[in-house]
């Protein structure tokens, strides 16, 4: 079963410090943490596509395994992948990719920004 737009918005929006906006026009909904993009939803496409930051090795493996995962347009193709949300990638793996994207972006933030995020979500 394919994950829907509402589920994707809700999941990305629940990440600590997550803010949504449309800096590229109303066809894209971008989720940022501390001003850095971790997910870009292509909301006018059907099925919906989401662009996520990925580890380069994992990206290569995912692209070989799942036709729904491709290099992202307009982003560095080594680090960013576009996922077509048509059920071609299992939902649990897609949610894990969102988590990974968020974590990779947070890892690249300044120490003070990471500390403020830990206050929001002290896990």
Placement of each model-derived feature along the sequence:
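Charge-dense, helix-prone N-terminal extensions
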Residues: 1-123
């Amino acid at each position: 079963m394919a994950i829907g737009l509402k589920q994707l918005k809700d999941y990305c929006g629940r990440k600590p410090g997550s803010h949504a906006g449309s800096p590229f026009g109303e066809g894209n909904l971008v989720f940022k943490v501390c001003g850095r993009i971790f997910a870009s939803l292509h909301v006018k496409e059907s099925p919906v596509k989401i662009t996520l930051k990925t580890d380069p090795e994992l990206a290569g493996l995912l692209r070989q395994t799942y036709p729904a995962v491709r290099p992202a347009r307009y982003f560095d193709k080594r680090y960013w992948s576009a996922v077509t949300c048509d059920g071609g990638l299992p939902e649990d793996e897609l949610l894990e990719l969102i988590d990974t994207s968020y974590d990779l972006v947070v890892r690249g933030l300044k120490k003070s920004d990471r500390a403020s995020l830990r206050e929001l979500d002290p896990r």
